[in-house]
Amino acid sequence: MNIEKLRVSGLEAAIRGMRNPYDSWEKSDSYFGLDSFDGIDNYWIPKMLNIYLGDKGVPGLTEENCSAWIRSNGIIYEDCDLCEFAFIGPNDMDLAQRLISGGSEHRKFLRQINVSFDLTLPFYVWKEFDTYKVGTTANSCSTMHTLKNNPITLDCFELGDFENIPFPKEYQRPDAKSNCDEDFIQMCLIPYLESLRLRYKETGDKKYWKELVRWLPEGWLQKRTITLNYEVIYNFCHQRKNHRLAEWHTIVNFIREHLPYASEFIFLDELKAEVEEVEEDSFLSELFVVLSKLGELKDGLYEYTHKDKKNKRK
């Protein structure tokens, strides 16, 4: 499988539109536009750094990682020396995350953030991906043209976690003239499919094409250009992140690592859990310091020394 040519658009309209119900456009602190790499590094990142470090900002964000976070999320496309940027400020981030936490009826702005990429998957994953029809458009490569013009080899199939399981002799027909138990896929299946392709190409007889399509395995790779939005991505990432198919894990991890503000918008629940864990650890550390000043630790418990202060009369 493969994911390439990622593009993200619509962030400016989405952030602007999410403030419409509140008539609060003056509170927006995000910036969008085009600039050079020098402009990004020398003007925009310092500007956003000052905004975030002087405000509440994103939970868990520190001075050490703030600059890297702003750059990695804010640059949404690079073209030679120019960058398209979308730097979302803390006010807009706070509102966006509250809307996301409020549910699908409140996070409508996610539907206005558009994403497109080329995705190559085997048929057995496309069948599940096609579940997400609403808000998704796809143009696929023609299976007919691909089969006709290109030789069928092992590389035409998904091999990411391929295990060449032998074809046991006890399951083969007793009158079989050849032994395919060592490598059934390469010795029998793929040569048979390639022979059907060649005979169809030579004769034009559709019976060969029909049999080729009939017996083509589900692991056959097909490329599609996909257009969808953050809401669709939000749904399938939460529904498929623990799926038994490894390909879904690859897709979810790609989204997590490459989409702008994926942690803050799509995986917000995980981000909150991490922040709560850090805050809990910090609280326990501070509590330990306080308790250690009050008493001595004995057998896993703190023993306190109580000193009565008696009022002395003169």
Task: Give the ranges of each region predicted by the language model.
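Family-specific signature for flavin-dependent thymidylate synthase
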Residues: 1-314
